Amino acid sequence: MTLTIALTKGRTETQVLPLLAAAGIHCEAIQAKSRRLIFADDPNFHFILVKAPDVLTYLNHGTVDIGIVGSDILAEQGHRQFDMLDLNTGRCRFILASTADFDPKQTKRKLIATKYPHIAQQYFQKQGEDVEIIKIEGSVELAPLTGMADAIVDITETGTTLRENHLKVFAELAPVSTHLVVNRLALKQKRTEIYQLIQSLQKVRPQEASL
């Protein structure tokens, strides 16, 4: 049976394609960087390229059998499917950051800017704090620099952008990496094919390494 896979476009796509190729999947057409969004060159694996926030939408509607997406999206959106494998790529971390004069222990209600309102709210609830969340889609780093927010919750890999904007990390919330997620019905109908893919990827994925 053919497996249809939703692959996150961009950085995730670039990092995961070598793993898929090493697992024996024909990815040449995707690696050719055309404007195509659907790839059916391998009779056993069909791919669609989508934006990260849309992967779970395709998965939840049963349009695809498998989604490859960052755990940041899984944590922010929530999902009803099976998170089957950490591919150990795209590794970064959620952080709380702000300007050097920020006091995490300040008693006044904090304004927190983020692309991840659910994750930010959960973090501060665990800290016993009631905060106001400001959702931003662009450069979150601007929020504390312009005074619009007290701090930000964002993901970072190396911290370079934070340092270049004179922002300091005050807390690390959780690790982030790329995961393989399987539709519930697909796991019943295509169990053998899915587990064969997972076993192949387990052999070629990078060993887990700390940031």
From Swiss-Prot:
Q: Does the keyword Ligase apply?
A: no
Q: Which UniProt keywords apply?
A: Amino-acid biosynthesis, ATP-binding, Cytoplasm, Glycosyltransferase, Histidine biosynthesis, Nucleotide-binding, Transferase
One of the record's GO molecular function terms: ATP binding
Catalytic function, reaction form: 1-(5-phospho-beta-D-ribosyl)-ATP + diphosphate = 5-phospho-alpha-D-ribose 1-diphosphate + ATP
Would I find Cell division among this entry's keywords?
no
Q: Name one GO biological process term.
A: L-histidine biosynthetic process
**Gene3D superfamilies from the xrefs?**
Periplasmic binding protein-like II (3.40.190.10)
Q: Which InterPro entries match?
A: ATP_PRibTrfase_cat, ATP_PRibTrfase_CS, ATP_PRibTrfase_HisG, ATP_PRibTrfase_HisG_short
Instruction: Identify the pathway.
Output: Amino-acid biosynthesis; L-histidine biosynthesis; L-histidine from 5-phospho-alpha-D-ribose 1-diphosphate: step 1/9
* Bilayer-spanning residue ranges: none
Q: Where in the cell is it found?
A: Cytoplasm
Q: Quote the CDD domains the UniProt record gives.
A: PBP2_HisGs (cd13595)
- What Enzyme Commission number(s) apply to this enzyme? 2.4.2.17
The enzyme class is transferase
Write down any Gene Ontology CC term: cytoplasm
Q: Which family does the similarity line name? A: Belongs to the ATP phosphoribosyltransferase family. Short subfamily.
The record's annotation in NCBIfam families points to:
hisG
Record's comment describing the protein's domains: Lacks the C-terminal regulatory region which is replaced by HisZ.
Q: What does this protein do?
A: Catalyzes the condensation of ATP and 5-phosphoribose 1-diphosphate to form N'-(5'-phosphoribosyl)-ATP (PR-ATP). Has a crucial role in the pathway because the rate of histidine biosynthesis seems to be controlled primarily by regulation of HisG enzymatic activity.
- Assembly and interaction partners: Heteromultimer composed of HisG and HisZ subunits.
Query: What is the name of this protein?
Result: ATP phosphoribosyltransferase
This chain's source organism reads Lacticaseibacillus casei (strain BL23)
What are the top taxonomic ranks of the organism? Bacteria, Bacillati, Bacillota, Bacilli, Lactobacillales
Gene name of the encoded protein: hisG
